[in-house]
């Protein structure tokens, strides 16, 4: 069966592709990695049982320091399973020593909506305390996201700032330079776009390590290039590729290695 992916779907930050059906089975277990998952009720998403997943370096049997954690944000149409089923993010846990946590975020573009749903607050005020309770280091975290999640990673990093975020990776980020360009449903209205515009957040993002990866055939490439031009401190890679699982999977190892290095940097680049 062939599948046609429309430009409109891509511009919505969508990643709801046929292989998402594999999410229900979960990822294959990887040597040296412990996988756990669970659910919680969220006051930031009333009426929804929120799923989370965690991949962390396997316990060695001795007391070890709290492991640093990367929060991975899925794209439109995804869920907590998506980073495992698509880019197999768990494969990069043991080599880097980083834990990776995922959570359901819906299709709300990781910010507070008129409906009262706020997946960004869900991450900061509920997921991070949950992870801290499991012995992970959450005083400083890293963020990675794809498509809608790439936008969300930049947005949350700008809100938390350099003292809480060691580094952020935005892959094929769903970015728009004006409200009229944005996908239907990405923002409630023009004011919502302005309040959550990551272009205007670049002065904060300039104070922490930012990595941008986007394929040259991706429909978001123009906006990502424009974003990078106003953020010269970012590590930007615009190489051959499209808005596809193939491109995202190929970037993941280098991205996780890059994030592991950000934890050795000072907690803030500016006072």
Where are these regions (language model features)?
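Non-catalytic cap/lid and distal C-terminal segments of serine-dependent acyl enzymes
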Residues: 9-18, 24-271
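Twin-arginine (Tat) signal peptide motif
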Residues: 1-11
């Amino acid at each position: 069966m062939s599948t046609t992916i429309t430009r409109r779907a891509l511009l919505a930050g969508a990643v709801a592709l046929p292989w998402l059906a594999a999410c229900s089975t979960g990822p294959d277990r990887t040597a040296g990695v412990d996988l756990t998952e669970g659910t919680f009720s969220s006051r930031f998403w009333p009426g929804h049982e929120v799923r989370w997943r965690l991949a962390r370096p396997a316990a060695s049997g001795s007391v070890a320091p709290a492991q640093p954690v990367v929060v991975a944000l899925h794209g439109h149409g995804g869920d907590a399973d998506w980073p495992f089923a698509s880019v197999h993010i768990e494969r990069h846990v043991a080599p880097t020593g980083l834990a990776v946590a995922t959570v359901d975020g819906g299709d709300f573009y990781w910010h507070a909506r008129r409906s009262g749903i706020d997946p960004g607050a869900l991450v900061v005020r509920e997921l991070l305390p949950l992870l801290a309770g499991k012995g992970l280091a959450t005083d400083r975290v890293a963020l990675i996201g794809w498509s809608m999640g790439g936008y969300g990673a930049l947005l949350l990093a700008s809100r938390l700032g350099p003292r809480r975020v060691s580094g952020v990776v935005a892959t094929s980020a769903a970015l728009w330079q004006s409200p009229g360009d944005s996908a239907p449903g990405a923002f409630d209205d023009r004011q919502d776009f302005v309040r959550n515009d990551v272009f205007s957040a670049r002065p904060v993002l300039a104070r922490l390590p930012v990595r941008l990866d986007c394929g040259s055939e991706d429909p978001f490439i123009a906006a990502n290039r424009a974003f990078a031009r106003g953020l010269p401190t970012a590590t930007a890679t615009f190489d051959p590729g499209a808005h596809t699982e193939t491109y995202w999977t190929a970037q993941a190892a280098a991205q996780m290695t890059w994030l592991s290095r950000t934890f050795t940097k000072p907690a803030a680049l500016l006072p």
